[in-house]
């Protein structure tokens, strides 16, 4: 029989060895010869090293090396020749950038350096091959990690960029997983007061969002996905908080959200059912059924 004492791990010693390995891999990112393996190892360990983001950000040449990985594959985007190997490698670099994007110590500097903009060419791609799909999904993951923090500075930054039309395009034609992350990003932008005001500021912006959400509802009625539907309903509910958008939604909310189309999909999802009921209630409140009931403007 083994004694428990010998089987017990020695966390401090192991942690120290791991720490030395982390430093070594970060150093190896600076050299093109050792970078690929270092990217792979660090991306595998990123969940278990809480302060990896500051280590990456403050170490010499590391962020430049990660950006070089991204820029290196721009030529493979158009014409679309990206291989699985290239995609895996750059996605490891993106995973490390996601780590920097979501850490409170490095997030502001990450935004100030406009690093998300380096990812936008990937979100512009339309090729349906797996390497491109993986690239888009991982890039969306970086933006998703940013908005998940619920920080005002993130929304303020994103609104100065083209992220909304990029997300809308992916919501219309991406894979189910990409659509889900893109819709989550839009939802997070809408849940911010500045984001909601921005989208409802012009009819063009609102109608673009409403049109894509409407198409998604139609698609979801044919190929249901409870997870994706949840985000779509939340986007609609949030839009209904804006008086002008609420007025427009009374005309353009898809019938499938008003009838029993999704009853089966949502039977166990009390949260989404509650949101949907609230949405319908919001659109009914203060509604004038007879236009003759609207007072005429003063002559």
Swiss-Prot record:
N-acetylmethionine found at: 1
Highest taxon listed in the record's lineage: Eukaryota
GO MF, any single term: transcription coactivator activity
UniProt-annotated location(s): Nucleus; Cytoplasm, P-body
One Gene Ontology CC term in the entry: CCR4-NOT complex
Record's keyword terms, sorted: Acetylation, Activator, Cytoplasm, Nucleus, Repressor, RNA-mediated gene silencing, Transcription, Transcription regulation, Translation regulation
BP GO annotations: cytokine-mediated signaling pathway; mRNA catabolic process; negative regulation of intracellular estrogen receptor signaling pathway; positive regulation of epidermal growth factor receptor signaling pathway; regulation of translation; regulatory ncRNA-mediated gene silencing
Tissue specificity field: Detected at low levels in bone marrow and thymus.
Record text on subunit structure and interactions: Homodimer. Component of the CCR4-NOT complex; distinct complexes seem to exist that differ in the participation of probably mutually exclusive catalytic subunits. Interacts with MYB, ATF2, RARA, RARB, RARG, RXRA, RXRB and RXRG. Identified in a complex with ATF2 bound to target DNA. Interacts with NANOS2. Directly interacts with ZNF335.
Similarity comment text for this entry: Belongs to the CNOT9 family.
Alphabetized PANTHER family for the sequence: CCR4-NOT TRANSCRIPTION COMPLEX SUBUNIT 9
Protein's job: Component of the CCR4-NOT complex which is one of the major cellular mRNA deadenylases and is linked to various cellular processes including bulk mRNA degradation, miRNA-mediated repression, translational repression during translational initiation and general transcription regulation. Additional complex functions may be a consequence of its influence on mRNA expression. Involved in down-regulation of MYB- and JUN-dependent transcription. May play a role in cell differentiation. Required for retinoic acid-induced differentiation of F9 teratocarcinoma cells. Does not bind DNA by itself.
Protein name: CCR4-NOT transcription complex subunit 9
Organism of provenance: Mus musculus
Gene: Cnot9
């Amino acid at each position: 029989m083994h004694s428990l004492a010998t089987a017990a791990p020695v966390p401090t010693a192991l942690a120290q060895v791991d720490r030395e390995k982390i430093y070594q891999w970060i150093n190896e990112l600076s050299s093109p010869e050792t970078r690929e393996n270092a990217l792979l190892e660090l991306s595998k360990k990123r969940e278990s090293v809480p302060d990896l983001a500051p280590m990456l950000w403050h170490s010499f040449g590391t962020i430049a090396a990660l950006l070089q990985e991204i820029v290196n594959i721009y030529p493979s985007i158009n014409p679309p020749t990206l291989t699985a190997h290239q995609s895996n490698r750059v996605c490891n670099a993106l995973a490390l950038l996601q780590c920097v994007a979501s850490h409170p110590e490095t997030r502001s500097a990450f935004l100030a350096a406009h690093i998300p903009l380096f990812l936008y060419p990937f979100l512009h791609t339309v090729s349906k091959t797996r390497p491109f799909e993986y690239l888009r999904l991982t890039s969306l993951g970086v933006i998703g990690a940013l908005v998940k923090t619920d920080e005002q500075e993130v929304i303020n930054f994103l609104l100065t960029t083209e992220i909304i039309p990029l997300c809308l395009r992916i919501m219309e034609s991406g894979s189910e997983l990409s659509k889900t992350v893109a819709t989550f990003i839009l939802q997070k932008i809408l849940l911010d007061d500045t984001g909601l005001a921005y989208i409802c500021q012009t009819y063009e912006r609102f109608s673009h969002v409403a049109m894509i959400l409407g198409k998604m509802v139609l698609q979801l009625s044919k190929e249901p996905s409870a997870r994706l539907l949840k985000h779509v309903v939340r986007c609609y509910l949030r839009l209904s908080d804006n008086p002008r958008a609420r007025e427009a939604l009374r005309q353009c909310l898809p019938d499938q959200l008003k009838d029993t189309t999704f009853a089966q999909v949502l039977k166990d999802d009390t949260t989404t059912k509650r949101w949907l009921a609230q949405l319908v209630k919001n659109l009914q409140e203060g509604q004038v059924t007879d236009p003759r009931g609207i007072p005429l403007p003063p002559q």
